């Protein structure tokens, strides 16, 4: 029989008493009253904050958006199919935040910054709030450095600066995403981090963009945040803020970033869906009253930081889709009023073969020539003026039968200038190539060619200039000015190439 040793038992009891830690945990809980359509109504959660994350019994996370007298309206970050009426919900005491780090470069993530490219977890040591305050007035400085898109029409006439917000607006299938992806491709070697946010897009379209970026080696400095059309409205609404938080991480580390929101019309629709299901009063076009604030608080996060904060920048290119060219609809007018200019893509121009289909007449950059190098300013001023005069003349010439020689020459020049603005997709040009192209057109060197020969001649001229006159590129990249020496080299190259080209065509 086992002997009972009283001293051993008393020691064990004493140890247990010493180890006992009386910790009282107060948990703010509630009960599900109703769930459906990505919305849950919760009774309880008395001390929940607006925007706080709440956790359901089966693991789904939601955001408390409506704090009403007798219940809390929560939007779900998942399908919530396992949530049952009467199940418990607890407040987490946290607001939505995501992990951030350099390791995100080259990855495709969702609105919660979780990888969706099948390449494993992403290590991160730091967190940022998805919704953080925009830099104040003192934290900013005016935009002065150019962000080159590689598209002649934009860099010469609608220049974009680092820290600017430039809207890309147009009907569906007019090349809005193409302008944005070309801009990402052109940042290669420019030390700019790019973030592409796809909101409510088809998964196939997002895959196509990612493939293009991978093939051209652009994914190594790009992060893709994707919430496709089948994602819950809550995640489509959050995706742009997640992208902004990732871009801010680099901006506050003295880096330059470019963020593309493709597109904000879909985010507004997702927010409208959430708001209507939460029974918030609808306003114009059934959007809620705070849909302006939805976009303004997002786009105000783009900035050029002051020198005391390291001069980092975040340039935003939001995309908005219009219905049959109606720029005066609710969301387009809102975003136009928030941004520093817009690039308008026209379906008519696109269908007539002018690509990128930029309508230079109603596109504008409110930063203007502050975002151009001196060399570009020297050659681009003439281009904009001549194109404006050409557009006016072209409309008039449709009604006039006999035109004088000067008018005919001006029309011919305008057609060739319009031709030099055409570019193939995924073929951005360097600043030096753009300056050379514009100079050739505005100084009448293309007037002797047929309109159909212009692009072929310019492609050959770029190659010829690069191989035989490399000093031209060196002068412009080092001095940022179109010097007399550079002009002499360019004139020489144009003349030599023109002679060669005419001989080729005759042969």
From Swiss-Prot:
Site (Required for activity) residue list: 363
Residues that coordinate or bind ATP: 170-177
Catalytic reaction annotation: ATP + H2O + 4 H(+)(in) = ADP + phosphate + 5 H(+)(out)
Assembly with partners or alone: F-type ATPases have 2 components, CF(1) - the catalytic core - and CF(0) - the membrane proton channel. CF(1) has five subunits: alpha(3), beta(3), gamma(1), delta(1), epsilon(1). CF(0) has four main subunits: a, b, b' and c.
Biological function: Produces ATP from ADP in the presence of a proton gradient across the membrane. The alpha chain is a regulatory subunit.
Record PANTHER family: ATP SYNTHASE SUBUNIT ALPHA, MITOCHONDRIAL
The protein's name: ATP synthase subunit alpha, chloroplastic
Gene name of this polypeptide: atpA
